[in-house]
Amino acid sequence: MSSSAHLQDAPPLLSGTLTQNEGQTSLRQSSSCGPSAASASESLSGYTESRIPHSKVRQGKGLRSIFPESRVKRYCCYGGVITVVAIAIVVPLSVTLSVKQMEQTSINNTSAASINNTSAASINNTSAACPSNWTEYGNKCFYFSEYTSNWTFSKDFCAAQGAELARFDTEEELNFLKRYKGSSGYWIGLHRESSEHPWKWTDNTQYNNLIPIRGDGQCGFLSDQLNISSSRVYVERPWICSKPKKYISQSQ
């Protein structure tokens, strides 16, 4: 039998052996240190690193891996800015309040001074004076009538002027009335119910008998003899009114 016939008739085991040998030869060739092997190794390494989780790569870096330094600085800057803004608001506000308080104090002081000045000016611009046609003496004003009437009418006339029939409280006032009246007899405010009763003024205060009163009449008058005399109520005479001086304001 020829050699080719022997090869064709070889059992399947030999064919499997040849195929295995060829695979081992191919594997040895692919595992050699050529360029293709190096590239494959590098690709595998890159793929491995890219698949490692980010948190594991940064593991062990502590606070910096959670709060990076740039973020901490940013928070510090924010805090500084807020502090500066707060100071910029509070300081001017405090200054403004202080200025307003000073202004209010100044206004209050000025108002008080103005009130005091006004009060002083009011006092300085007032004076005691008597009405027109009245004569001033001491702290009183006197009116000497130019007409005549009975004692009752004379009393009512003086009351209508806010006064009373003349009253003297000192001898100096009496002497003034005597000099000023001239030679005529004038009704004054003395009266009594009868010769058995005391003399009184129109306000019913009792006369102090500074000067004795002559006559037996019920009403007193200043006589032309510079004395005080009495007469009947119906006799007509001129009269004298008296009242205290009042302070009046003087216009500027």
From Swiss-Prot:
Gene3D superfamilies: Mannose-Binding Protein A, subunit A (3.10.100.10). SMART domains: CLECT. The chain crosses the membrane at residues 79-99. Residues 30-43 have a biased composition (Low complexity). It comes from Rattus norvegicus. Residues 1-58 are annotated as: Disordered. It holds the Pfam family Lectin_C. This is C-type lectin domain family 2 member D3. Disulfide bonds join C158-C241. Its main location: membrane. SUPFAM superfamilies: C-type lectin-like (SSF56436). The keyword Transmembrane applies. Glycans are attached at N150. Residues 16-29 have a biased composition (Polar residues). Residues 1-78 are cytoplasmic. Residues 137-242 form the C-type lectin domain. GO terms for cellular component: external side of plasma membrane. Lectin-type cell surface receptor.
